[in-house]
């Protein structure tokens, strides 16, 4: 069987790849009966030369491959009929903007293996970039804090070589005594937690977070039953929340009263209560002034996220009084970082990690 590593063609350019040269060598060693070629790319984080030196043929023609492996959606005009493809199609949730892509896949007799639905026996996703979204999202939040307050300056993550370089930059800054709230329990939240821990920011209990003032920056990581409560007052399990979200209301405002920087790393399920609404954000008791919305659900559970932002222009402001977008420098505006393709800013690490998961 012949495998081809495809060139990423989506715009804006995505430098990630499923297999680094080293990981592709492991693939070849693990499955010696396979043949592997790499489509030439001038944007990939690993150069054509790096793959050639690792022993792989570089080609412009993948028509004789049986299986083609990529990261993001393949443009319709680049799809090759009668092939097996691995990539994120962004069609699983019936996204209307990719309806034509799905139709083309069917018309061209393509077998699609979507990374998003490759799971274990319990239904847990095996492949994804959540960790890297959390890592970069937390970093970008601190970068936004420095820009908003004009107290320190951090380079864009995309201009740094790798994760250690990113952490080195964070450890050059001095933070005020802020309270940082992190929601979630999955890969995204764990990635953000890695950043907070690498900065030696102390983690505190919910009780202390809500009631105690500190003379240093601290953070608290919370899950669904911490920021939601049953309407009838019962305290049950996470499973009950997932199965009966309509039986719950948000209990997030107790955290919003004391939080300075909020990192949204949770998964928001359909029918779940919004964490905070536009009316909540207008309250005198709403203290959050910076949101890194890694989850990036537009006009939904995090009211200040009006739109996704971009790597080129990652932050904007949200005016609680008008519920409108303003410049992030506007007094009293909530600063919002809502980039929806964060792993692209850490392409080398994300690619290395992707290959580990894939094999």
Segments predicted by a language model, with ranges:
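Glycine-rich phosphate/diphosphate-binding loop of Rossmann-like nucleotide-binding domains
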Residues: 10-41, 153-258
